[in-house]
Amino acid sequence: MDPFTEKLLERTRARRENLQRKMAERPTAVARSAPHAKRGREPLSEASNQQQPLPGGEEKSCTKPSPSKKRCSDKIEVGAPDLENTEPIDVAKPCSPMPAPRQAKPPAPAAISESVAAPAALLSADRGLNSGSEASATSSVKTRMQRLAEQRRHWDSDLTDDVSESSYFAPVPTEDKAASPSKPPISNASATPVGRRGRLANLAATICSWEDDVSHSSAKQNSVQEQPGTACLSKSSSASGASASINSSSVQQEATCCSPRDGNASVRKDPSSNAAHGPLLSASVSSSVKASSPVTAATFITENREAQNPELLHKTASPLKTEARKPCEKPTLSQGAQPKEEANREVCLQSQSKDKLATPGGRGIKPFLERFGERCQEHSKESPSYRASHKTPNITPNTKAIQERLFKQNTCSSTTHLAQQLKQEREKELACLRGRLDKGNLWSAEKNEKSRSKHLETKQEVHCQNTPLKKHQTVASTPLTSVTDKVAENEPAVKLSSTEPAGSTESEMTKSSPLKITLFLEEEKSLKVASDLEVEQNTEAVREVEMSVDDEDINSSRVINDIFSDVLEEGELDVEKSQEEMDQVGAENSEEQEDALNISSMSLLAPLAQTVGVVSLENVISSPPSELRDSNLSAASPKPGKFQRTRVPRAESADSLGSEDRDLLYSIDAYRSQRFKETERPSIKQVIVRKEDVTSKLGEKKNVFSGQVNIKQKMQELNNDINLQQTVIYQASQALNCCVDEEHGKGSLEEAEAERLLLIATEKRALLIDELNKLKSEGPQRRNKTSVISQSEFAPSKGSVTLSEICLPLKADFVCSTAQKTDASNYYYLIMLKAGAEQMVATPLASTANSLSGDALTFPTTFTLHDVSNDFEINIEVYSLVQKKDSLGPDKKKKASKSKAITPKRLLTSITSKSSLHSSVMASPGGLGAVRTSNFTLVGSHTLSLSSVGDTKFALDKVPFLSPLEGHICLKISCQVNSAVEEKGFLTIFEDVSGFGAWHRRWCVLSGNCISYWTYPDDERRKNPIGRINLANCISHQIEPANREFCARRNTLELITVRPQREDDRETLVSQCRDTLCVTKNWLSADTKEERDLWMQKLNQVIVDIRLWQPDACYKPVGKP
């Protein structure tokens, strides 16, 4: 037995002993009136957490001195005041329970895991009402009576009070019993023989009923657990209510509300049924729903007994006769009254069970007895007889009408009940959902033997219940009972307003299902283990929504969907799965499908019932495509599958056993495995390259570069560029053809710009044609030569050349004359830079009018040519354009304007003059007037190379004699090598230490032109290097492995550097002084041959780049090449 169950049993035992001690200490009571006797009976008045009692009119009678007797009768006895009062106002009083003390922890269903016979012996005959059906097969009537008599012998002299009361209460008409089916006076052992005979007669009738109906133990057990003034709650609901009652804090409110509802309901039922058994009929509705077949069998037996012994029937309210009469009288009563009456009574039951099940007979013991009966029913449920015993009562339109009428009559007293009931439903939701979360995979152990019974139970309780609460009573399904009780202890009480509107009819309440959404809210909270603040916020939202549960003008489902739209996506998964199972089970019974399904605001937890009750792994089925069900549910819906819900597609197969397991992982390892699988990344094979073959890498790079340049593709690109330039030439020519006079732009800056564009396009087209011809003539042979060279030697890296601060000096005489002559011609200059066909740029136009700075024209633009090799050649070409002013005076213009008449001679003259004027342009191969040649003329050129770096003034070639240019061009040229050779690693360096050679392991970093080394890698960021080796000072033609004759260490490379000699230099093992230079021999040893080769490749690349791009910055190599 687990510690939790043992603790519950200990607390129950302590409570019982405390009650016995308290009752023994009470003095012998004299005959008292019913209300006073009722007030005096408070065995648990000193228990912890007791709330203030209600007014005396609403207190419960409790005159029996023994807790054992209370337990024996606490579910079926009729309260003394009930039997005396016949008016409905008085009838209501006994049903209002005293504020039950909040017990620290009610007994959990786990405590009921014992066999059926064992608890009967444990609890003695006082619990025989719960276990009598099982024990009746092995005990006789005489044995039981003896046991009861012996049990009551240790009760003290207080019994006289009870005897007088019981003998006085027994003959009262049973019409008053309708108010509250409380305890019948069956077991008072006192000095008065009448009282004893009456009790024994009652007990005999009860036991006879058990023996006659022993085969239907499960149904009887379920109904024996009824509470006074309440309908017989199904086992799961009772357990759920008992477990959820831990955090209840509204006993008085609920107890107060319970009274008027039951009284009114029973009074209204009397005209339509036997007055003596109205309440008993209503109390049996849920039992008949759960197991109508066995109870009906018991009905015929007990009815025969009633005909034979009517006096005994009035005197004794045997629980089994009560149970048996209910289904028997159901046909006589229109079935609408039953569910409504049961709804009212179940509301009261929920309130009482939530608050420690405060019943008149035994307030502290009821939860344990109920759970014992529930466990017994669990065992009996597994048998086929139990499954076969489920029947569904038929519901007619008259039933619905009576239900609505009764509900309207009771709305005044049900307002507070609704609020309290909704609160209990919230707590049960949380308990069940967290029970699911805690239970995890443990459900799969009971899958084979209990899944079918669970399906039937859920189907009948959700699909076939007539009352609002019955739909909710399946929340605590049997596998969840113990977990529910455990979780309920830590569950925060959800406080709801007690002034909730409750004026809508049954059919109106079926249109809204806010609690379904509330279920998803609570489920999300339990699954995510939200913080208390988040729980309070969600509860506030629930409270706001629940205030309009029964408002007929608001579609609560739509409102809550808006509020909890994000919660629905997660919560609907399990509900949808369960809903499909409900549809399948419901389709098997055509009779049940014809019945109407009444859903009120009290029964909106049906989705929860489906989720929890059908959560076994067999229900994992593929959901159909997503669809939105209708928000409003018709009252005559034949299936429970019409609740409003958003179907969420779930990609799971029917045989996927792990679907629920994936949702509710039960261990950290399982969660981690699931998480890693879900976030599985593509497998990346990480390789730490310490033996990289740089030679092959460089070879591949060069081969790829040469191979990727397809000849045909290159030729196609050149042709496209040629066509593009041809288009530019044509457009520029058309623009220039329009410049015929000053009015049309002749001599303007626009004309000069058009000439510039024409010049650039023409020159570029010529370069592209030249490149195309080279490709056609040489083909791939020329590129193969370069690739062979690059493979045999280390190819230098590409670089970039930057030209800036370009200026073009002019002759001083020309500058002076231009300044004096304002009507002189305009001189435009243009510098064009050519570095092959693909890289050609031109400067903007510079004129003597606006770009003259001193005696030179300045070009502020900076040009950078990228990806040029070390043997680059940049051709600088200077072009000039002279725009002369119009020499015609104003008189000639006037005369020309006068002769406007066109004569044949003038027309011929104009044609011939135009032809002579544009004769130079007509020679274009594009046709007459198609294209033009630029009027820019070349006035100087120069070729720049790497050797030009460092100079700023270059002489121009081909300068005309009368040109205004001085003959030089000034610019600044700079080069940058795009070499990104870097390497890091450990090398062992040979050093001279006091004349002795020593190898020291260093962390070496090759960056730029230097090798810097430290002792440790971390020192690179914190300390200055121990030493540096400048590769620009290397005089070796190529870095090679050290000669083994001089250096025996393997994997060693030799690097010889020189530097100017210093005064303190002297010869060591690694350095020698020659003339004015100090030559140092550096031996660097790698760990492996591959690493040595890698370092050699990197160092050689750096040396090549230095020597080719910075020839003046390094020493020339010495020795053989």
Curated annotation (Swiss-Prot):
Residues 1-25, 147-157, 303-314, 368-384 have a biased composition (Basic and acidic residues). The modification N6-acetyllysine is found at K366. It comes from Mus musculus. Residues 725-1121 are annotated as: Localization to the cleavage furrow. It is found in: Nucleus; Cytoplasm, Cytoskeleton; Cytoplasm, Cell cortex; Cell projection, Bleb. This is Anillin. Residues 229-671 are annotated as: Interaction with F-actin. Keywords: Acetylation, Actin-binding, Cell cycle, Cell division, Cell projection, Coiled coil, Cytoplasm, Cytoskeleton, Mitosis, Nucleus, Phosphoprotein, Ubl conjugation. Required for cytokinesis. Essential for the structural integrity of the cleavage furrow and for completion of cleavage furrow ingression. Plays a role in bleb assembly during metaphase and anaphase of mitosis. May play a significant role in podocyte cell migration. One of its GO terms (biological process) is mitotic cytokinesis. SUPFAM superfamilies: PH domain-like (SSF50729).
